[in-house]
Structure formats: structure tokens, C-alpha cells
From Swiss-Prot:
The lineage of its organism: Bacteria, Pseudomonadati, Pseudomonadota, Gammaproteobacteria, Oceanospirillales. It is found in: Cytoplasm. This is Peptide chain release factor 3. GO terms for molecular function: GTP binding; GTPase activity; guanosine tetraphosphate binding; translation release factor activity, codon nonspecific; translation release factor activity, codon specific. The gene is prfC. InterPro entries: EF-G-like_DII, EFG_III/V, G_TR_CS, P-loop_NTPase, PrfC, RF3_C, RF3_dom_3_sf, RF3_GTP-bd. One of its GO terms (biological process) is regulation of translational termination. HAMAP family: Rel_fac_3 (MF_00072).
Amino acid sequence: MGLREEIKRRRTFAIISHPDAGKTTITEKVLLHGGALQKAGTVKGKKSGQFAKSDWMEMEKERGISVTTSVMQFPYDDSLVNLLDTPGHEDFSEDTYRTLTAVDSCLMVIDSAKGVEERTIKLMEVTRLRDTPIITFMNKLDRDIRDPMELLDEVEDVLKIKCAPISWPIGMGKGFKGVYHLLRDEVILYQTGKGHTLQDGRTIKGLDNPELDQVLGSDAENLRGEIELLQGASHEFDHQAFLAGELTPVFFGTALGNFGVDHMLDGLVAWAPSPQPRETDKRMVEAEDEKFSGFVFKIQANMDPLHRDRIAFLRVCSGRYEQGMKIKHVRLGKDIRIADALTFMAGDRARAEEAFAGDIIGLHNHGTIQIGDTFSEGEELKFSGIPNFAPELFRRIRLKDPLKSKQLQKGLIQLSEEGAVQVFRPLNNNDLIVGAVGMLQFDVVVHRLKSEYKVEAVYEPVNVSTARWVDAKDPKKLEEFKRKVSENLSLDGGDNLTYLAPTNVNLQLAIERYPDVQFRKTREH
């Protein structure tokens, strides 16, 4: 297969959802359909000796944080799919946001009993930065769910994206019978108890088929009425609008019952884009360019001090990686030979023989690689669009031993370069303030300061609720702003001026009072 064909068959996507919407279960079932797992291990089935392939393995746990979970590659039909995991609950961090900059499409999973939830809203905001195409899976149809029409309306209102239903549920909870596939004009019947295996559901072709009435009884007439209503009230699928991030195809199903996941995957490989062109400071890089290039979007540190390896995750943007090839680390101006990059075939770390645009490879990193770094076959490029996000949680960090302030500063700056947290130094005092988007980030920092930098630190509350990067076109206006609000200003790890607001009201007032100053939620790496 030539370079062009290899790239065209790739689909790189991430799953976004609120915790407990069923993301891990759907990841399992996606891998099951991709032939990567013979029998899906549901997350809760720990006692049955199966546990989730994409959750942390015991062996991985013993030596720190799992890296296998982060990327899973598997074949599906004629495509090769790269699924990037975005962590759930506590380990939610900026990594989650940045992972979304490394994909070409996203699958949004919604708990149909609850509808659109807060984490989903935040993640969707991030996909908007690049108008990423979104496919929606309404999950948990084997439970009592909200009215499906209401769910579509909520997605449209809250997330500002048009919905085009592709499948439609027949019944719900204990009375869930299956779905009607609008594009194929067929009913696919649901069988219970098949959650761990692939099921060939019985299909009935055509809404007017009398067989439907025999199998579904009165539900058949209800379905016909609903579909008629739906066709008048909802959007038809439009591929161009989907690619522009304006419309989402919606599938209904139950990941736990392994039903509907294959319909969604069929849609994903048929409609989601293959690797897309990427913006750099010099030019657009096309995926099919002959020469290799890529950027680092995430660094995974190993929590175990005995294994000081950190893995830098690199999204290949163009060309082909081959084992042992020489590539340029552009920021350092250094050529390096990469002999031991990792690929991630569905949960197993393996030496990468080769990788193509759209694939993710892992580079061993001993502290020289930073988030946002570009690697190329010699060309001086920098990929743009790898942002820092304004943190939402803040703590002041204090040393137990005041004599170690040099080590503390060094440690914090290195950890912030790696994207573990953000560090702010107020202009008016010598405090060090740490900012994060997830609580776990704080624990990781204290742990790593102690094990890697021999610094014992504790946190204290600090009166900061949100942060914005600030700049102004007119230097005089910026100077005046700095004079007037100096008690709210800090420098971040890269010496960028930041406004730390004690409350959201304070921030709004500052934005109104200083119209010539730009307050930004994101900053480029």
C-alpha cells in the first residue's frame, strides 16, 4: 500500500463525555468490534476476572501510570482506527483538552437518562477551537431514558450544533426493542444478554413491512408515527455540515448491551475525515506530504521514581515514520535518531516499525521534550494550535524547608513545561501559585517534587478563582493596566502576563473597565 492509501484509510478520534456516561464501556465495545478484544471486559466485571482493556492494568498500576490506555489502534473494515482516550474523573487535566487537538474527529457519548452534562459542555468548547467533526452516541437505552426528541433539542440548544438522527430507539429500559436505521430503512432488533460478544441482530427491511407488526406489536405503529414526526422536525444528515463541525449524526444504543456501537463505527469510518492538513508558522502541512512531521500534544510522566522515563505522545501530521530514522527536534535545532518509538496496538506497547500521518507514536523523553514541540525531517516548522488552557483550580505552594526555594522553582518550571500544572509568580510578592484543571494534578506535583527534586511542599488555599492571559496592542494602555491592577497580575512559567481574578465578577468588571486589553482563556504553546 502506498503512502497516500495508508493515510486515506486512517481515522483518528477521541471520545468525549461526562464521567459515568459509559465512555470506558464504549471504548471496550469499539475494540471488540475492531477485533482487538475477543471478549470485552466490562469495567465493573472485575470479579469475573475480566477488566477493562482501556482502564489501568494491575501491572501498569504497580509501575506507575498506564501509557497503554492513552492510544489504541485497531482495524475496522478497510480502515485503521486510532482511538485516543481522554481520562475520566479525577485524572481529568489539561492533557484531556490537548488530546482533542491531536484528533480529526470526536465521538460524544451522552447518558440518555441525564442528557448534556457539564464536562461534555467544556470538552465541546475545546473541539470548537478547530471545528472538529462530532458524532453522537446516545447511550444506556437499556435503562429508562429521557424523551429522545427532548435529548436532541437539548444538544442543539446547549451545545449549539444541529442534530441529524441516523438511528431511532424503539422503546426503552426493559421495553427496549431495538432501533430503526433511517438511512438504511431497516429495523435492527435488540437481544439481551449479548453484551460481551458480537451479535448479528435480526433486521427487518422497510418501515411498512408487515413483519414489523408481528414482532413489535403496537410499538410498530408508534415507531411509524415517530419517524414521520422526526422527518419533519429534525435535520437530514449533510456530510459537508458534519465536516465543518456544524451538524452531528446521532446514534442510539447501549454500550453495555453492545448494541448500536457497530452502527456508530460504520458511520465513523464512512464519514469522519482522514488525517487533515495542519497549520504551521510557515505553511499548511498536508498529510500526504512525503516528509515526516509531527507535534507533541501530551507528556505522560511515570509516577515510579525508579522508572524516570516519560513518554512524549507525538501526532504524526505528514509522511511516514520509520524505525531508526533521523528527525529534527526543531525547538532545540537538534537532529536525533529515533530507534525505539512506541506504537499502541489496542493496549499493547510495541516498537514502532513504521507509522503514518494520523498515527500516534510514543517517544522516550528524558526531560528535553516539551508540549507543543515539533519534529520534522529537517524543515524549520512549528505547528500551531496546541494551547494552554486557563486553569480552574488554584493553590499557593509553600516549602517545609525555606532553604530549598531554588529546587522548588526549578521543579515547578520543569513540571509546567511538561504540562503537569501551570505555575504563576505574582508581580507583587514572592508567592508561587499552582493552577490546574483537575484535582489529581495537585497531588501529582507534590509527589513528583518530593521524589524527583527532593523538595517537600504543602498547599494552602489562595484567593483566586480564575485566570486569563492578558495583552494589549497599545503598550501604553498595557502599562497603565499593569499599574492599576498590579495586585492581580502574575507571570506564568513562560513569563506571560496573567490576570488572576479572585471572583468571576471581578473578572467581568476588569474586562469592562479595560476594553483595550485582551483577556484570553487559551495561550499557544
